[in-house]
Amino acid sequence: IRIRVLNSAILAPSPHNTQPWRVAFRGEERIVLSIDHTRLIPGCDPIGRQAFISAGAFLENLDLAAKSEGFRADIDLFPGGWPDARTVAKDPVAHVDLIEDRRVDCDPLFLNIPLRHTNRRRFEEKKVPLEAAGELTAAYDFSLVPLGFSHDDDLIRSVADLAAKAMEI
């Protein structure tokens, strides 16, 4: 089961397609996910922020794949404690235990994992239609992170400026 779910997990997006993760097996069910320091890109990701985002995408793909197999992925984030935000810790990002659980349902997103690709084309400068934004908002059910849309050009520019400044910090 671990190999099957990892086949989907490794399709997660990563900075410059570096796939900066390392996986180890412990016991029969545990997967230990860590950042592979040999794959970091200090020039454009000095504190590993993008590597950690990539690890999160890896875990999401793993979770979706586990559900498709009738397993629950019990994910323990930063089991050694939360890392210092200014460095890339050597401690594991997560311990994942795969538990057979026939009550879990296959998420329809699972079927899209192999379809994901990097779009390197220039973005169109059109706004997300209100109807599409409403459909996305209605389908979103992860309460820890808010989802919202804006057609306010000043707000969009302000958020874009903050994102650019975040790369300098």
Feature-to-residue mapping (PLM):
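Acidic, surface-exposed loops and disordered segments
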Residues: I1-I169
